[in-house]
């Protein structure tokens, strides 16, 4: 589900290009454990993966859950959350699955413990005009793998025969 994607901060095979759920969320709505509506909106979205150097701004609005329609519900509170981009990834490792708090960002990577996500808006990306994915795996000495990766990167990094390098 869309809510499960956010709750797990999922990425899939295109995460190398565009990141995981947190990178591509425009906004989402959820019902909290106390029965209120919570709307979370990413402000000033760059339409790209979150950079470790960036500060990411979120607007969090809590609305009265006694009103069934969240659009008509009374606003109980609004706050802005600023999180450093570095909390979303570990240097050299990609997504940091050990950091469940994520600076206080509700629901993302919490596996459903903050509430039930009911809807979301996403940043969509146009697929590149490529039809094949190649995944490389190396065994043996890391120095040999490093040399091979550098050679491949130099070849593909220049758009060799329509190839696109990601990773």
Predicted features and spans:
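FAD-binding subdomain of flavoenzyme oxidoreductases
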Residues: 1-152
